[in-house]
Amino acid sequence: MTSRNCPALLIAAPASGQGKTTVTAALARLHARQGKRVRVFKCGPDFLDPMILARASGKPVYQLDLWMVGEEESRRLLWEAAGEADLILIEGVMGLFDGAPSAADLARRFGVPVLAVIDGSAMAQTFGALAHGLKSFQPELPFAGVLANRVGSTRHGEILRDSLPESIRWYGALPRSVDMELPSRHLGLVQAEELADLDARLDAAADALAQSAETELPPAVSFAAPTRVSLAPLLAGVRIGVARDAAFAFLYQANLDLLQALGAELLFFSPLRFARLPAVDSLYLPGGYPELHLRALSRNGPMAEAIRAHHAAGKPILAECGGMLYLLDGLTDRGDERAEMLGLLPGEARMQQRLSALALQEVELPEGRLRGHTFHHSMLESPLQPLARGECPNYKRTAEAVYRSGRLTASYIHFYLPSDPLAAAALLRP
């Protein structure tokens, strides 16, 4: 296999909340409208930003992370995208240099130039100092330039532009506008399907970008070929039911791809709307927002009975975060409303007003060693003894429990299944 060349940018910022998702989505929508094939990636383990970016580009969005995804798998994803795209966009995470690994680490590793998005709404000449710091903090960092966001007027944009050193390219400015805002929830953005006017917002952002910013394709980046890896069909003939609806939507596209590459047939179903399970051998219950759908979930008795029968028959279930909460005795929301859940795992969970856990996790299971992350606002009390506990690579004390009851495996951890394909197959193989 040989290297592939494709124009690429990594959209980063000095901090969260600067508008990375808006700018990345606007670039994706603008170039897609021009007939270009755009592939978008997201740094880190986030679920919600990729939903918006997939809508903007018309293509599935994958995560890139030097630890959770791994360097070799990240290389493969970028190389494959370069073979089918006219433009690759990567949205960073947090601030450009924040975290270990950071967005800057990814940019350096794969030679992708950084476009820094800076919220200029409350600054003038300091904009140039901030841009200079981002460019020069790591001299070896490939740096494309800066784009100002939430600019108050044409004159304000000119002041920001003129504050830049000559060595930093000005990509333009996006005006402050409610028409382009992407509402947020505690995990970041709301889910794409919850925004009835999302396409109008994306088009408005793309229009504004076309009028006030540089929109030519960036220079091509050479993406090295990955090491070829072959997967045995360990799940050949296995039918896996995957919950996917407004309550359970936190799915890594890479997880679905892996299960299919292992030979599984995926059948999607809705615990909110379906009265019965499809004919499946295994179940995958991902995370989401079950606390926002307590009544609908608790009132769907036929679905609850079907999942209980699946478990009683000794069939595999993998439940992550919100999927695990659905299997408890009960769940209480922030308004102190409690609902009966499925009762397959002893315990109660209660939603908290603040974040309860945020960390990368790696856990050793009998089936293998899986990586992933945890991010939740609930607290769980259960008498069940954990099968194992996760470890955080960044020295945080977070150590999420993994519970097992028969063939049911449940945890707050959102697993990145390609981190150990053999373990993924063993968890879901009948």
UniProtKB/Swiss-Prot annotation:
Record-annotated active site: C321
InterPro entries, A to Z: CbiA/CobB_synth, Class_I_gatase-like, CobQ/CobB/MinD/ParA_Nub-bd_dom, GATase_3, P-loop_NTPase
Positions of the GATase cobBQ-type domain: 239-422
Molecular-function GO terms, alphabetical: ATP binding; cobyrinic acid a,c-diamide synthase activity; hydrogenobyrinic acid a,c-diamide synthase (glutamine-hydrolysing) activity
Disulfide bonds: none
Pathway(s) it belongs to: Cofactor biosynthesis; adenosylcobalamin biosynthesis; cob(II)yrinate a,c-diamide from precorrin-2 (aerobic route): step 9/10
The protein's enzyme class: ligase
Cofactor: Mg(2+)
Pfam families with a match to the protein in the record: CbiA, GATase_3
Catalytic activity: hydrogenobyrinate + 2 L-glutamine + 2 ATP + 2 H2O = hydrogenobyrinate a,c-diamide + 2 L-glutamate + 2 ADP + 2 phosphate + 2 H(+)
UniProt keyword list: ATP-binding, Cobalamin biosynthesis, Glutamine amidotransferase, Ligase, Magnesium, Nucleotide-binding
Entry-linked SUPFAM superfamilies: Class I glutamine amidotransferase-like (SSF52317), P-loop containing nucleoside triphosphate hydrolases (SSF52540)
Residues marked Increases nucleophilicity of active site Cys (site): H414
Domain commentary: Comprises of two domains. The C-terminal domain contains the binding site for glutamine and catalyzes the hydrolysis of this substrate to glutamate and ammonia. The N-terminal domain is anticipated to bind ATP and hydrogenobyrinate and catalyzes the ultimate synthesis of the diamide product. The ammonia produced via the glutaminase domain is probably translocated to the adjacent domain via a molecular tunnel, where it reacts with an activated intermediate.
Purpose of the protein: Catalyzes the ATP-dependent amidation of the two carboxylate groups at positions a and c of hydrogenobyrinate, using either L-glutamine or ammonia as the nitrogen source.
UniProt similarity note: Belongs to the CobB/CbiA family.
Protein name (database record): Hydrogenobyrinate a,c-diamide synthase
Species of provenance: Stutzerimonas stutzeri (strain A1501)
